Structures are given as structure tokens and as C-alpha cells.
């Protein structure tokens, strides 16, 4: 009983120590208000983050494998088995990459050890996007290739101010076109001062000749949290009739970037190897082209630069090139096909490399391959033009 009384007395004493709101000084009241407000804001912030993560995770999906693509403005003629033909691959960088543009996900290191990182999450302005897309589509018009493979074509995207870039390329007179979607993101709030936003993009294939069919296939991608911000990587196989009764198989692709160590790109290359063999065994002429995001000339330091070789790049593994195929890239160019976007473009200072090109079957004769030097006026990539013939003997 004595113990119970003591406990009761202690509790009563503690209660007396607690002051009512009116008994607090103004300073003490302010401290309590600040603490309550801070706690409420912290709770609200945590709740907001949780809701946003649920939004990103629940909104995530991958497009199905083996999707038949729509063909716009199809042509009727087969491509001639005789003479020379051309194909251009061009990553147009969603119209954002003017020479002064840097991208927040790009990082690098200067030769003196100074780290570098890009700034922007969206294009500088809508006018800049329109200028760049008009410029890159103008290059296609100027060179008038028989076929074109275009990467990072945006539509209904925050990062490119909702400019429908498909129109600029599908509207080029004389071309049939297809689009394989490889980016469909939830709204990304990072970087906080210039959020990347909600975006849609794809790989376009253009043809002056009849398209028999075009199909989108899924590439493997990372399975960790990075999948929520990465592209839904894919490639498209487009079949074109040749007037000797055979078929040209054009494989349009865009492999993973920001893949430290190249683990995912290795898986993608292994899948591509299988696909190349299958298309060749069907009797097709085969040309795979696009942005491989891997060095295609076995020289990571070919071009003068004030920067070290970035950690994301590695050379394409020749073991992933099947029999009867070869990499075709411009080894003799004075400029790379891609610049680092961690710093503003300046020739001779910014890191450049050759990651855009082709893998070609041995029943196709390579006449020439050329990086078209645009001085990176409209994109962080230069277009690459392949001139070829069909072997008919």
C-alpha cells in the first residue's frame, strides 16, 4: 500500500511540474509551436515521399515483347538489288542538346581530377527544341538516305516541352516510317531545380521503299531501382523487299547508357547476336544500326580531350559478333559520333567517342561509312552514314 501511495504522489508531482499553455512564457510558446510545426512538416514530407515512390513503382510497366508496329505512309516499290544504297543512324537527343546544353545524368572527370556533371533535366527552351529538331531532320532531308534510324524521338514529353518530334521525321516526303516506343516514364521530380518530368520517346525507322513488316522486341534491362528511371530498351526489326526476291532486315536499336561496367549492355549484345544469326539464316541481308553506347572502333582515346575516359564506356565485345557479321564504324573520322554532355561542347576539350554505327552481314558489301560532322550543333551525337551494295552472286 505504501508503494502505491508513493507512486501516486510521484505522478502528482510530475503533473504539477507541467505548465499549462497560459503559464508558459512567449518564448516557450514559440519553441513549442516551432517543434510541433517542424514535426508536422517532417511527417508531411515523409508521407509525400512515400506517396511519390508508390506512384513511381505502381505506375511502372514494361511494354510487351514482340509488338507489331504500325507503318505510316508506306511505299510500294522494292529496293533494287543493283547499285549503291545508304542508311543513316542519328540519335537526335530529344531535341535538347545544343552545344551549350549539359545533362544532369552525365558525369565526367577532367585530366586534372576535377569532377564534372551536367546541369539540366529539360531542354533549355521550346524554341531550342524546335531549332534542334528542325536541324536534325534537315540533315536527313539534305542527305536523303534510302533508310534512316532515328533514336530519342520525343512526343508528349515534359523534357522537350511537348514538341511532337515524330512529325518532323515522319513528315519528310517520300518515307514510310515506324516508331518503336522505348521510353514512357512517370513524372521524375529530379533534378529538383529542373525536373526531368513525364516523358515518351521512341526509335523511328524511315524507308523510301515498301515496308513488309516492322516489329518491336524488348531488350533486357536492369532489375534494380534504376529501372524506374531508365528507358524501356528495345530494338525493332523492319523487313524491306529486294527486287531479287530476297529481304533486307534493318535492325534499329538503342542500347543502355549509364550502365557502369556494361553488364546490361552485355546481355543486350548477346540477345542481338542471336537475332542477327536468326535473320541471316532466313536468307536476309542484315544491317543493325543505332546507338550502341559502346565503343565500336576499339580506341577509347582516339580524339583529343581535356577529360579522362568516362567510367560508363567500354568497347563492344567481338565475341558478341556472330559469324558472317562485322562491326562497321568510322575509324578514320577526325571527330567522334558522340560527345560527353557533362560539360559544354568545345572541340578538343570535351570527351568524344564512336558509339554510333552498324553491324553488317557478309552478303552486304560496305562501300563506305562516314561520321557526318555537324559540330554537335543539334544533338550530343553526330549522324553516321553507311553506303552499301547487296551481294547477289
Which sequence ranges carry the predicted segments?
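Active-site beta-strand/loop signature of hydrolases that rely on acidic residues for catalysis
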Residues: 86-92, 116-122, 132-162, 206, ...
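Conserved S-adenosyl-L-methionine
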Residues: 177-185, 214-220, 368-372
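Metal-dependent phosphoester-hydrolase catalytic domains
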Residues: 20-41, 54-75, 277-287, 294-393
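Surface-exposed cleft-lining segments at the edges of enzyme active sites
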Residues: 119-125, 153-155, 219-227, 254-265
Amino acid at each position: 500500500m505504501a508503494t502505491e501511495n508513493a507512486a501516486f504522489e510521484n505522478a502528482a508531482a510530475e503533473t504539477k511540474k507541467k505548465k499549462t499553455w497560459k503559464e508558459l512564457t512567449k518564448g516557450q510558446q514559440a519553441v513549442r509551436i516551432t517543434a510541433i510545426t517542424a514535426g508536422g512538416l517532417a511527417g508531411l514530407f515523409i508521407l509525400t515521399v512515400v506517396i511519390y515512390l508508390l506512384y513511381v513503382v505502381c505506375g511502372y510497366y514494361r511494354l510487351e515483347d514482340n509488338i507489331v508496329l504500325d507503318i505510316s505512309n508506306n511505299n510500294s516499290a522494292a529496293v533494287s538489288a543493283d547499285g549503291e544504297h545508304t542508311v543513316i543512324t542519328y540519335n537526335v537527343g530529344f531535341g535538347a542538346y545544343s552545344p551549350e546544353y549539359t545533362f544532369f545524368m552525365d558525369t565526367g572527370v577532367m585530366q586534372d581530377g576535377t569532377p564534372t556533371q551536367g546541369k539540366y533535366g529539360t531542354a533549355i527552351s521550346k524554341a531550342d527544341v524546335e531549332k534542334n529538331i528542325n536541324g536534325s531532320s534537315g540533315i536527313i532531308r539534305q542527305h536523303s538516305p534510302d533508310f534512316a534510324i532515328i533514336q530519342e524521338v520525343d512526343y508528349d514529353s515534359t523534357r522537350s516541352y511537348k514538341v511532337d518530334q515524330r512529325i518532323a521525321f515522319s513528315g519528310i516526303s517520300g518515307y514510310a516510317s515506324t516508331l518503336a516506343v522505348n521510353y514512357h516514364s512517370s513524372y521524375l521530380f529530379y533534378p529538383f531545380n529542373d525536373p526531368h518530368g513525364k516523358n515518351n520517346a521512341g526509335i523511328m525507322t524511315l524507308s523510301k521503299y515498301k515496308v513488309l513488316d516492322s516489329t518491336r522486341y524488348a531488350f533486357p534491362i536492369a532489375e534494380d531501382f534504376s529501372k524506374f528511371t531508365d528507358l524501356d530498351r528495345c530494338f525493332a526489326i523492319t523487313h524491306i523487299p529486294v527486287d531479287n526476291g530476297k529481304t533486307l532486315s534493318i535492325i534499329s536499336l538503342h542500347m543502355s547508357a549509364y550502365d557502369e561496367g556494361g553488364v546490361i549492355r552485355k546481355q543486350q549484345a548477346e540477345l542481338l547476336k542471336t537475332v542477327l544469326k536468326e535473320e541471316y539464316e532466313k536468307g536476309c541481308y542484315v544491317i543493325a544500326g543505332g546507338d550502341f553506347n559502346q565503343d565500336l572502333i576499339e580506341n577509347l582515346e582516339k580524339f583529343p580531350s581535356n577529360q579522362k575516359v568516362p567510367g560508363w564506356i567500354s568497347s563492344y565485345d567481338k565475341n558478341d559478333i556472330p559469324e558472317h557479321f562485322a562491326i562497321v564504324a568510322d575509324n578514320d573520322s577526325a571527330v567522334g559520333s558522340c560527345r560527353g554532355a557533362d560539360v559544354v561542347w568545345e572541340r578538343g576539350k570535351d570527351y568524344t567517342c564512336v558509339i554510333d554505327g552498324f553491324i553488317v552481314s557478309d552478303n552486304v558489301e560496305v562501300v563506305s561509312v562516314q561520321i557526318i560532322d555537324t559540330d554537335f550543333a543539334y544533338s550530343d551525337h553526330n549522324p553516321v552514314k553507311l553506303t552499301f551494295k547487296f551481294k547477289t552472286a
